[in-house]
Curated annotation (Swiss-Prot):
The lineage of its organism: Eukaryota, Viridiplantae, Chlorophyta, core chlorophytes, Chlorophyceae. It is found in: Cell membrane. Protein transport. Probably involved in vesicular traffic. This is GTP-binding protein yptV4. It is a lipid-anchor. Its main location: membrane. The keyword Cell membrane applies. Keywords: Cell membrane, GTP-binding, Lipoprotein, Membrane, Nucleotide-binding, Prenylation, Protein transport, Transport. A lipid is attached at C212, C213 (S-geranylgeranyl cysteine).
Length: 213
C-alpha cells in the first residue's frame, strides 16, 4: 500500500517503562508480559490514516540503559516525533524525564513533536506519580500528554496517532520543509511491511528478560 507521508518516531525513556510493549501493542495489537530488554535500537512500522491520507509511521524503539544513550542520541536526528515514556509506578522514571528531554532537544530538530506518556496506568494500586504531575510537566515543557497501558491498550492508539496528527498539522502550517528528510518526514509512494522488525545487525540481538506493562 502506498503512503502520502512517512513519519519517523523515536521512543525514549528509562529501561523497563514499557517502550517495547507500547510499540508491540500499537503494531501487533498484543501484549507480551515478559519482554526482552532492548539492546541498542529496534524497529516497527504501521500505516494509519489522517485526513484521508495514508501515513506510514516508522518507529525506533530505543534502549533505556545509560550505556546505550550514545546510540539513542544518534537516532534523535531525523525523527519527526518522540514518545517520552515513564512508568507511573516508579517515581525515579518520572524524575529522569528532564534528562531525557534535554537530550532530545539538544540532538533533535527543534520542531520535533514530543508526546509525554505515563505508562502502566492500569496499575493504579501502585501509582507513584499522579496524573496531575504528568500534566504539569507536559504543560511546563510544551509537550502533549497521555497516560497509557500497554497491557490493556488504553490510549496506546491515541498516543501514536495524536503525535502523527500534530506532525501533519505542522506540515499543513508550513513548519517543515518536507523535501528535507532530516526532519524525519518523507513524501512517499511505495510502502513496506508493517510490524516489529529487527534493527540493523548487532543493534537488537543481545537481550535480557524484563517485565513489561
Amino acid at each position: 500500500m502506498s503512503y502520502a507521508y512517512l513519519f519517523k518516531y523515536i521512543i525514549i525513556g528509562d529501561t523497563g517503562v514499557g517502550k517495547s510493549c507500547l510499540l508491540l501493542q500499537f503494531t501487533d495489537k498484543r501484549f507480551q508480559p515478559v519482554h526482552d530488554l532492548t539492546i541498542g535500537v529496534e524497529f516497527g512500522a504501521r500505516m494509519i490514516n489522517i485526513d484521508g491520507k495514508q501515513i506510514k509511521l516508522q518507529i525506533w524503539d530505543t534502549a533505556g540503559q545509560e550505556s546505550f544513550r550514545s546510540i539513542t542520541r544518534s537516532y534523535y536526528r531525523g525523527a519527526a516525533g518522540a514518545l517520552l515514556v515513564y512508568d507511573i509506578t516508579r517515581r525515579e522514571t518520572f524524575n529522569h524525564l528532564a534528562s531525557w528531554l534535554e537530550d532530545a532537544r539538544q540532538h533533535a530538530n527543534p520542531n520535533m513533536t514530543i508526546m509525554l506518556i505515563g505508562n502502566k496506568c492500569d496499575l493504579t494500586h501502585r501509582r507513584a506519580v499522579t496524573t496531575e504531575e504528568g500534566e504539569q510537566f507536559a504543560k511546563e515543557h510544551g509537550l502533549i500528554f497521555l497516560e497509557t497501558s500497554a497491557r490493556t491498550a488504553h490510549n496506546v492508539e491515541e498516543a501514536f496517532i495524536n503525535t502523527a496528527k500534530e506532525i501533519y498539522k505542522k506540515i499543513q502550517d508550513g513548519v517543515f520543509d518536507v523535501s528535507n528528510e532530516s526532519y524525519g518526514i518523507k513524501v512517499g509512494y511505495g510502502a513496506g511491511n508493517a510490524g516489529p522488525q529487527a534493527a540493523k545487525p548487532g543493534e537488537g540481538d543481545a537481550r535480557k528478560s524484563s517485565s513489561c506493562c
